[in-house]
Regions:
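Left-handed beta-helix
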Residues: 5-6, 11-12, 17-18, 23-24, ...
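Glycine-rich adenosyl-nucleotide cofactor-binding module
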Residues: 1-2
């Protein structure tokens, strides 16, 4: 099950893999697909339609 902090903004159409974490103030936009065990750091931005594989880390404010 993905873990999303309350202050993060994840679009309803985004897909988050098992074990993925989205931290405070991060954004994951429409149609984005994140694999398993990914980390989206504080304040990071994942744009519309972006695809990330498994075990990826997007650093804070990236």
């Amino acid at each position: 099950m993905p873990r999303v902090q309350p202050s993060a903004d994840v679009a309803d159409s985004a897909q988050l893999g098992e074990g993925t974490s989205v931290w405070h103030l991060a954004q994951v936009r429409e149609g984005a697909v994140l694999g398993e065990n990914c980390i989206v750091g504080r304040g990071a931005y994942v744009g519309t339609g972006v695809r990330m594989g498994d075990n990826c880390k997007l650093q804070n404010y990236a």
